[in-house]
Amino acid sequence: MPVDFVGIPAQKADMNQAAFFLYNSATHGREPFRPIDPKHVKIYVCGPTVYDLAHIGNARSMVVFDVLARVLRRLYPRVTYARNITDVDDKINARARESGVSIDEITARTTADFHADMASLGNLPPDIEPRATAHIAEMILLIEKLIAQEHAYETHGEGEGHVLFSVASDPSYGSLSNRSPDELLAGARIDPAPYKKDPGDFVLWKPSADDQPGWDSPWGRGRPGWHIECSAMSWRYLGEDFDIHGGGGDLIFPHHENECAQSRCAFPGSHFAHYWMHSAMLLLDGEKMSKSLGNVLTVRDLLGQADGEAIRLLFLKTHYRGVLDFRYEALKEAGKELDRFYRALQAHPALPDLDETVENPVLEALRDDLNTPQALSLMHGLAYAALGGDALAAAQLKEGGMLMGLFTREAEAWFQRGINPDEIAQRIADRLQARKDRNFAEADRIRNELAEAGILLEDGPSGTTWRRAS
């Protein structure tokens, strides 16, 4: 039985008692999802720090929570999905110094790049996308609450202008990441500071030099710490308690642990997020991506080599809690799988209406902790049936794929992606003329040239048609 997490009763999962099951990182177990208000589900997901292009590990997490939002919208009448933009951070400051470009220009450009990349992967925009710099007032108010309740303290002397959270004031600190006090201290020793009462105390507010971004506050001109930003923005838009908090697994400690502590302590009696979801790490050819290894692959780079829908499908083939080992061979295979899916849909241009009282088997799989591998397996079965003439299976395939953000275009558009139909039509006309002139060598050369480009010609009674090679 999973342990209780800060007063929230741990639930035993029973498929007969609940419609939707999630793995809750807070209780370290799979549980039935029971929203605070079944009429309005609220989600908060940690978004990007906008100093550089998103890499494929970032993108995987965003795809996971896009699918979550889509499924929740299918199951509940109203969903509010908030995902922040961190536009004040020391990494942004450093990038501005290195590049000689203003912070505003860097954050604006990188935010636009992020939006474009996410759209290319089929992600819908969140309902709310707050920027940290637009919520400094809420952060200051939250810090004042923590000081008033003796969960935070202002420093003087050497650390003048800092406000720190006191981890000793929160008996539940460490419960989210399931870390012992010794483990927490070991992490804190990486960057000790003499003005801390406890090595594990973390920054809520810090002073800014003249050349750094800063805002006036009761503690002098300064800027917020990383963790307080998300606490303030989730509070502003979702309230003291909300349903689901998501992010990458690398954020569990210290970011989510600290976020959770701040919010619980600022609002006594609240639970903050009732469910915590985390996507696992992504490896690149078996190795962890890192700048020191020089193997960080950005979404933008990958989109230059593959279609965004194929990248999305590849992400979904591994369960979100499983480590995904990204390999180019697997990406190519994902493209072929999409060919098959779209071929099945293309065979049924007019899809029948589905019986709303009969649940799509794909949705049934997604109810089980977003089991996307199982959902895709079922979709392959539906595609097989659709290719055999089953129009109902084709309709279920289309609906199931859209639940996962797939099939966002018509089949014809998928097969013609990256292709200029006018150029192909001209080459077909050239080949036809060569055949009329009995220049069969030239006709064969044109056919072979198109085949090498992935275009197959098919001669029939009504003329020559073409299709993309599977």
UniProtKB/Swiss-Prot annotation:
ATP binds at K291. Its main location: cytoplasm. Its EC number is 6.1.1.16. GO terms for biological process: cysteinyl-tRNA aminoacylation. GO terms for cellular component: cytosol. Its cofactor is Zn(2+). A motif ('HIGH' region) lies at residues 48-58. InterPro entries: Cys-tRNA-ligase (IPR015803), Cys-tRNA-synt_Ia_DALR (IPR015273), Cys-tRNA/MSH_ligase (IPR024909), CysS_C (IPR056411), Rossmann-like_a/b/a_fold (IPR014729), tRNA-synt_1_cat_dom (IPR032678), tRNAsynth_Ia_anticodon-bd (IPR009080). The gene is cysS. This is Cysteine--tRNA ligase. A motif ('KMSKS' region) lies at residues 288-292. It catalyses: tRNA(Cys) + L-cysteine + ATP = L-cysteinyl-tRNA(Cys) + AMP + diphosphate. Binds 1 zinc ion per subunit. Belongs to the class-I aminoacyl-tRNA synthetase family. It is found in: Cytoplasm. GO terms for molecular function: ATP binding; cysteine-tRNA ligase activity; zinc ion binding. It comes from Granulibacter bethesdensis (strain ATCC BAA-1260 / CGDNIH1). Keywords: Aminoacyl-tRNA synthetase, ATP-binding, Cytoplasm, Ligase, Metal-binding, Nucleotide-binding, Protein biosynthesis, Zinc. Pfam families: CysS_C, DALR_2, tRNA-synt_1e. Zn(2+) binds at C46, C230, H255, E259. Monomer.
